[in-house]
Regions:
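Membrane-interface junctions
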Residues: 3, 129, 166-169
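Secondary-structure boundary elements
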Residues: 107-162
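N-terminal accessory/pre-domain segments preceding catalytic cores
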Residues: 20-131, 246-352
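A short, highly charged nucleic-acid-interacting micro-segment common to nuclease
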Residues: 159-173
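Hydrophobic/aromatic-rich core segments of domains that either
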Residues: 172-244
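Solvent-exposed loop/turn segments at secondary-structure junctions
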Residues: 106-107, 146-150, 168-170, 195-199, ...
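Sec-dependent N-terminal signal peptides of Gram-positive bacterial secreted proteins and lipoproteins
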Residues: 2-21
Length: 352
């Protein structure tokens, strides 16, 4: 009896869902003709929830890369797990390799797709009031970093967990940011990599995202926008260059990304909270602006560790920060605290 590997459709989806229609072709365009052919087969199979793609001509690592790239281009596909099973079947002297997918939401996929679109719409429609892409991305970043709980105990890495459960890991944060950006017509791609350890080696695997404003691309890491000590937002990794990100991130170059060389649109630069060279006068202006805006918790970035050390010495060892507070008009500040983050060259100020 001849043995055949049969790929069956476990769920029939006649129409492409609105969630999967929000997409980019960035990764696909980096592939050669054979890679694009496999990418397209993966796409057709996933949209129909077919069990597998048979007869692939790549090894397991390259199949996983192309599959991951497909999910990167289609962040709204939440009903399939990010990992594949690579299956080899021997028929006589012939071996056939297949990609096997692992699906979720089998019982209520059509209903869950509608729920997903509705949940996303509840937030995305608020973005329509803004006509500036930087502001739109700022609100997306702020929403994810402030309201979504980060939990390594949560296994779902898709957007579903972020919008339905309010919980996610870095993949969910990145894909949600990308999806919302694409909805607004802002080009966006996912970045694969690792956190960088203090000794420069690879840390835990990590995903973040890039988006295009005008003619330039920028890095965003909404997962690292969450502070561990309270519920405030850290904009250190908002709208940054690759050079800046590589201080704390390592990029997996198996997944090509656009060049990003500009830091002039970072949150610190736009909000005038970046210090190239420390001076008491310059910091006093930043403090006065923060108090005027009502920002009782704010972050200042420095060009180097030495400049941040100078600021710490002057402000908190010599207690000049207290003198600055006394000089503010109508400022009722009873206490303050500060935290230094050497990895991101930033200082967080909390005033009460």
């Amino acid at each position: 009896m001849r043995r055949r590997l049969v790929c069956i459709a476990v769920i029939l989806i006649v129409a492409v869902s609105a969630a999967s229609a929000v997409s980019t072709d960035w990764f696909r365009n980096t592939l050669d003709a054979d890679g694009k052919a496999l990418y397209d087969k993966i796409g057709k199979a996933v949209l129909k929830c077919e069990e597998c793609v048979p007869g692939v001509g790549y090894d397991s690592e390259e199949c996983q890369r192309i599959y991951s790239g497909y999910l990167d281009d289609h962040p709204g596909i939440f009903w399939v797990e990010p990992g594949i099973t690579y299956r080899t079947v021997t028929l006589g002297n012939r071996k056939t390799n297949s990609i096997v997918f692992n699906y979720t939401h089998q019982d209520n996929l059509a209903a869950d797709q509608k729920t997903f679109v509705k949940l996303v719409d509840q937030f995305s429609r608020n973005l329509k009031q803004y006509d500036n892409d930087w502001i739109k991305l700022y609100h997306i970043f702020s929403y994810l970093s402030k309201t979504i709980t980060y939990s390594l105990d949560y296994m779902d890495q898709s957007m579903w967990s972020v919008f339905f459960d309010g919980i996610g890991v870095c993949a969910g944060f990145a894909r949600s940011f990308q999806y919302l950006a694409l909805l607004e017509g802002i080009p966006s791609v996912v970045v694969h990599g690792w956190g960088r350890e203090p000794d420069g080696t690879k840390g835990e695997p990590h995903l973040w995202v890039m988006a295009k404003i005008g003619d330039s691309w920028y890095h965003f890491d909404p997962t690292w926008g969450k502070y561990d000590d309270d519920n405030s937002i850290k904009y250190t990794y908002f709208c940054r260059s690759q050079k800046y990100m590589e201080q704390t991130h390592i990029i997996d170059m198996r997944y090509p990304i656009p060049a990003a060389n500009d830091d002039t649109m970072s949150y610190a630069s736009i909000r005038h909270r970046y210090i190239e060279k420390y001076s008491a006068e310059g910091f006093a202006k930043i403090l006065a602006d923060a108090v005027k805006r009502g920002d009782m918790t704010f972050t200042v970035e420095f060009s180097s560790l030495s400049e941040m050390t100078k600021a710490y010495q002057d402000l908190f060892v010599n207690r000049n920060f207290l003198n600055m507070i006394y000089q503010l008009d109508d400022a009722e500040i009873l206490s303050y605290n500060h935290f230094e983050y050497e990895d991101s060259l930033s200082m967080k100020i909390i005033m009460i």
